[in-house]
Amino acid sequence: MNLPAVTPAKSDTASPMGEIIAVREAVVDVRFAAGHLPEINSALEVAWDGGAPLILEVHSHLDPRTVRAVALMSTSGLARHVMVRATGEALRVPVGEAVVGRMLDVTGIPRDNGPALPADVPRRAIHSDPPAMQTENASTDIFETGVKVLDLLTPLAHGGKAAMFGGAGVGKTVLTMELIHAMAAKYQGLSIFTGVGERSREGHEMLSDMNGSGVIRHAVLVYGQMNEPPGARWRVPLTALAIAEYFRDEQHKNVLLLMDNIYRFVQAGSELSSLLGRLPSRVGYQSTLATEVGAVEERITSVAGAAVTAIQTVYVPADDFTDPAVTAIATHMDSQIVLSRDLAAQGFYPAVDPLASSSVLLDPLVVGDAHCEIAEQVRESLARLKSLQDVIALLGVEELGSDDRRTVTRARRLQRFLSQPFTVTEKFTGQPGRSVSLADTLAGCRAILDGETDDWAESSLYMVGTLDEARQKEQVARKAAAGAAV
């Protein structure tokens, strides 16, 4: 889409003016007068007729008079000799109560066809340093999600960071949306959803779903969509962080920060790295990969009185978990949730791989001995089931020893019990969503491990909430079978 014609801006002494001397897609070179070179990461503005200014961000100084900037908007229609105004500061985006319930772009402009934001809305720079180490609150309080498999095997911490790893189509976005519901329902906190490289269709669907369910009243949506320049996708996590930091520091609110998909942030950085002429590193990624990821992740932390809990989805290219981008992101995480294509194909949702997923919080000193014992026994049962799959496929369960048959019986029931209907999928499945407390999850797994459900039909444990619900389902099935027999 072509932008309106450029109107050359008039120079003034308060705002140094520069002239565009080169445009290479999302990279723009600007020349200023001697002694007026803008600082790194400061914002530049190009005035357009009848529209918001095009925002550039200074990336490097080429010589004493020239800067190289990254465009945060489309540069279509931009030309040499156009005048640019230096703002003298980093991009500042709107924050506070006025943005709650709204969808914003990387520059903080509403994109939901709603009213304009108030003129006096507070603003905050997208670039800031992490809180001083002595002010950080290293909390180990558990963030209960109501999702059985997460609370049992990969507990999340208030103020911690968790990542959901998975390829395309395994349920990352659906699980993310369910966690937004959990934050609004259980903690009366604020959720900030960041769509990094999201498809426009997905963003529209999420906004519609949130409006329909009322969750939008407790959420802020910030999008850098797939069709936008790499600069927008590269900086949109910082816009979301600025909003989250305001609610944490100024209003002392708990914030759930969700990023879908942080891998697209890395991809955008890789695109810009090529446009900036840098030599690529392994697998074509930018040589500054670890630094860029660290700059985002280290700002996600908690201070006394308020927590920012971050959950990020990570696309795994070709399901290769050794990919440099995946490993760079994983090093910052407290909990790693791995979504399995095999489990998704079998209909087990959420398709969380209980053997590949992990959490540093699954420790007796944090969650208690009983929780750790049950989680370990569940993992052992599921690991044994996996190791026996080939034997079962060739010879059948009947050829196993009695101990292995018992283990397989209980492991299959555990698999089904850890599945769960979600609130966000109600309109597709027709099945009401379930949120299960940690106590009910532990009690249900304990009963299955003790053999209480050995004579139940496996289907009775599939897509239920608590064990009591499964018990009722089993009783109904038995009555129906008895009636059919008569």
Curated annotation (Swiss-Prot):
Molecular functions (GO terms): ATP binding; ATP hydrolysis activity; proton-transporting ATP synthase activity, rotational mechanism
NCBIfam families: atpD
Primary location recorded for the protein, binned into one broad class: membrane
Compartments in which it is found: Cell inner membrane
UniProt source species: Gluconobacter oxydans (strain 621H) (Gluconobacter suboxydans)
UniProt subunit comment: F-type ATPases have 2 components, CF(1) - the catalytic core - and CF(0) - the membrane proton channel. CF(1) has five subunits: alpha(3), beta(3), gamma(1), delta(1), epsilon(1). CF(0) has three main subunits: a(1), b(2) and c(9-12). The alpha and beta chains form an alternating ring which encloses part of the gamma chain. CF(1) is attached to CF(0) by a central stalk formed by the gamma and epsilon chains, while a peripheral stalk is formed by the delta and b chains.
Stated name of the protein: ATP synthase subunit beta 2
Catalysed reaction, written as an equation: ATP + H2O + 4 H(+)(in) = ADP + phosphate + 5 H(+)(out)
Gene name linked to the record: atpD2
Similarity field: Belongs to the ATPase alpha/beta chains family.
Membrane topology reported for the UniProt record: Peripheral membrane protein
Listed CDD domains: ATP-synt_F1_beta_C (cd18110), ATP-synt_F1_beta_N (cd18115), F1-ATPase_beta_CD (cd01133)
Functional description taken from the UniProt entry: Produces ATP from ADP in the presence of a proton gradient across the membrane. The catalytic sites are hosted primarily by the beta subunits.
EC number(s) from the headed UniProt entry: 7.1.2.2
InterPro entries named among the record's database cross-references: AAA+_ATPase (IPR003593), ATP-synt_VA_C (IPR055190), ATP_synth_F1_bsu (IPR005722), ATPase_a/bsu_AS (IPR020003), ATPase_alpha/beta_chains (IPR050053), ATPase_F1/V1/A1_a/bsu_N (IPR004100), ATPase_F1/V1/A1_a/bsu_N_sf (IPR036121), ATPase_F1/V1/A1_a/bsu_nucl-bd (IPR000194)
GO cellular component: plasma membrane; proton-transporting ATP synthase complex
Keywords carried by this UniProt record: ATP synthesis, ATP-binding, Cell inner membrane, Cell membrane, CF(1), Hydrogen ion transport, Ion transport, Membrane, Nucleotide-binding, Translocase, Transport
Pfam families assigned: ATP-synt_ab, ATP-synt_ab_N, ATP-synt_VA_C
Binding site for ATP: 166-173
Signal peptide annotation: none
